[in-house]
Amino acid sequence: MRVIYRGDLDGIVSAAILMEVGLCDELVQAHPKDMQAGKVDVQEGDIICNLPYHSNCGMWFDHHSSVIDSSAMPEEFTGLVEVAPSAAGLVFKYFLPDHPELSKYEQLVKETDLVDSADLTLDQVKNPEGTFLLGFLTDPRTGMGYQQDLNISNFQWVSSLVELLTKYSVEE
């Protein structure tokens, strides 16, 4: 199954959880504006995380209040959409009851909540470590995307993080 996700920490952690439960065999990064403009090829059954809804999707997870208050909010869908600190937290909440092995992501999800909701201390911003540093590096507005002289593209690096997070902790 394809997972269409935003290439920030929230989207990456959401996709990693979906990969962990066996629902992800292909990753597609997308930007919200491209989703809204219809530029993303959403196929029947795709799982969408942290991005606007598309009628072809099989599951949808989002936490933005603008989506919930929108007329584009579908009446019925599979997944979870509610105002929350992160979409990763919603994916975690949705699958944890049937997949207790996901408990290994609990701390990562809590820290992703803090990063995505910008609920950080001054020290976490000025001296980021662990998940907070990863959040900064993966943020398209502040991170590695601005570096043009790297051996790997930002797109490739972000995509590799999804699988790496299923195998290693952030510190590893």
Task: Name every feature range the model reports, one short phrase each.
Residues 122-172:
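Acidic catalytic cores of enzymes that act on phosphate-bearing nucleotides/polynucleotides
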